């Protein structure tokens, strides 16, 4: 087994454990146990947990790295980047925690994505200062989207979740309609919220519309 152990296999196992149980459960000892190797075999790939977290972050971002393409509209490419980030954050519930733990400057794929985002915002006509703000807002916006009310919580069963939603919906519907007319009227969608896909797509639309509107103002101003 040790001969077959790859850096990628270690990282993927770490992401699985982190997503199911939280990052604190990701230890060299636990990983070695899950992978059927000795801790020393893992130190060959990662000398400590900090290096492992950097590897995890790099692997996460690898899934949506795109190179800046001047032949395609910048809006399309920026949307692709943000959508890719949200998709990765959704797939691995521990992803946001991993990205918060690491120094982004130590993660090669993060630097690639960051550089691409800055280049795309520059194409849109923003100043250097604005480019930097946009890249930060997009990262934080994607993290907030994926951590929002549609995020999956592995601890709750589907039955428990359905019952919890039913109680919340009934609570809102029982509010006095003369005081909270709109909450009572929209109690269903407020609690059910539609699909995760709709939630994420709408959220990315809001982020991108803000940037596109400001870029259009720059062109007309």
Task: Identify the function of each model-found stretch.
Residues 59-63:
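Short, basic, alpha-helical segments at the C-terminal edge of helix-turn-helix-like DNA-binding modules
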Residues 116-170:
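A contiguous pocket-lining binding segment that forms or flanks enzyme active sites
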